Amino acid sequence: MNFDNAHEGIKKLIIAQYLGLFAAAAGLLSIFLTMSMSSALNASAGLKAALGAGGGALVFMLATGGLGIASIVLTIIGLVKAKSDEMNFQTALTFTIAGLGCTIASNLFGSVPVLPGLFNLGSTVCSLFSTIFIVRAIINLSETMGEMGMVKSGQLLCKIIFIAKAAAVGISILTNFFPFLYSISILNFIISTTSVAIEIVVYLLFLRDLIAGRDMLG
């Protein structure tokens, strides 16, 4: 069978995942540089050292935001293209748009108590289901094409991603509803780096599945 739309859509999803991976890496670097700035100030290492670390952190923060936006846009474009070949891509598109809406709402209502936390949590949950439904779409296409090895690896990936994203949801709850944890610098660092590390692992696993799906359909 011919799944040209899914093939083209998945190619765009792969580019989106690369951008998302670079965004996560930039976010991780910004965390380390922010901690370096804080350490420089606390240790009286000098204003120049602190400003250098702070400037670097700002650059990587901006890179994280820009790459993240580009990744979401390409994801939506890819899913719009692929959805005509497999209905799970349509479901993933719905969750992706809902997650984007939650992110925008979180920024719009940033000064309102509780609401930003709820919207951030909603965005994380939407990301979980969007990823799962994309993997499910590739599983269904693999089954149609008789690629049972891809079916089994996709089913395993669904479980791994669900566990990893569930951990991300737990971290989202901690950071959004127990903000006092951020007043403890070491906990702030551990929570932030763990969250980004989980995100990077999911990106890599998901990217591997997308590439396999593209090659199968190509």
Regions found by a protein language model. Name each.
Residues M1-L33, A70-N107, G122-I171, V196-G218:
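Membrane-interface extramembranous regions at the lipid-water interface
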